[in-house]
Amino acid sequence: MDIDNDLSRILRSNDAPTPIETTSIRSEVEIIIGKISLLHAELQGLEEQLRERQGALSPVRRLPPEILAEIFSSSVEGILDSEGRDALLDLGLVCKNWRRASLGSHRLWASISVDRHQCNETSYQKIVAWLNRSGDLPKTFMFDHIDLDYCECEDHDPAEEPCQMSNPALIKLLSVGPKLHKLVLRCSSHLCFRTLLENIGPEPDLMNPRPWDTLQSLELELATADSSPWDEPLEASKSLFYHLPQVTSLDLHIPYSSSAFEGDPSDTRTVALNVPPRLLQGLKSFTLHCDWEGSHILAMLQHCENIETLIVDFRCEALRYDEGDILVHRFTASRLLLPKLHTIHLQLTPIENTAIFDFLRTPSLRNLRLDMMEYTHKDLQEAEFQKPLLSFIKASNCEGTLQSFHLQNLSLPAMKLARALLDLPLLTTVILDHRHFDADTFWRRMHYHALKNRRNGDTPLCLPHLQELQTLCVPVDDRAVVMAVAKFLMENREINAFPCTWKVSHQTATQAAIERELADLEDCGVSFQVIPSHRWF
């Protein structure tokens, strides 16, 4: 830019400009600012062109529809409620390729969850169209009660305020809708579920089965409203569950005893659930959420001769029986045989509830998971854990089949827990999922047992077939703990020829802080992985 000689003198010195020079300089400043603005606009335009062209070259545009579908499936998981459905539809609005990929992935459309406001005559065809996009894949429908503890039918005349479970669109869907694999129902009371059964009708047309009749999986959650305590008839043919379809997977949420029996849980011993034996005999998977006193669990399990997976949620309540209970005496004298059962999962169970193992015999058991309540130190010292567990395993003769042992919140003293694992030598997977855990003492004890194996051939081998160790929600920021685990695993390699992986879900230590231990483990054939934690607490 040409600059006047007089202005050049001012710009190259520290002299103050005259009024005339000030006016001239200000004029030059405005010209320069204008040119800068033009250049900025040109730069922004060029940057936008660059982004467009780089976007056109992006590998994302060349992803096959199958890969896009896999990515979409990871971003919208589970049974899709209104928010999940909106997220899936938004993916299809990005571009034509994404829309084709989302519509072409049948499993994205295989489930839907609605409440009564989203399940009506207007939306019925939309629900059917959504599920039909899944092609021949198994379909899941969930009817989610808005308020699980309340329904209008409790306080009003049903003619004026109909029960939520008498929803015409719901009845139509279960009667003439698309074939369903799984149905999830959340009802505010057993009376509401009876209303649904009455509207569906008990007698199936064998020549024309309804979606209700051909269900393979049913999850039924029953709450108990204040005005509807449990008053089911004792006669089996009049049972609430008598007309359930012949599913192979049942997830049953029994009402909480405190609400179902007006604060007197012992009344649960005088009633019968009366789940039909023909239904229980056909189950391969059975999940039961029940805190009732009495032998209700045994009464149902005695018919589950084909069950393969059993999950029992005790809701933090201890098992209590009558002293003269016939089933308790029967299965104490001769354990209940469940020949095909390979997976047991006890949830929210007091440690004394492991006594349920005293009644069972499972020769095919492969996977055992215990999710326990937390206890004080005094409680732990008095708790009996090993005896019923090990007696159960011995009576079942499943030492050779039991492969996976998952313990959550079982904060036993370190010595007891180490001894329990020592008595299960054929485990291939051990998962310790504890928030409060004396890890240093435990792993030092495990290392002691492993070291003793090498020095004394007569002692039981310490996890000689271990292939996967998971320490979930257990911090590994303590280098001493890491070293203790590493010493055990390295000693274990001397008697274990199988590849082994150590997985953690809680890592606060830097990689450098434990780099040496991890390198030594890798040299011994043990890989280290940090995995996501899926626990909500």
Map each language-model feature to its residues.
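Leucine-rich repeat
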Residues: M1-F537
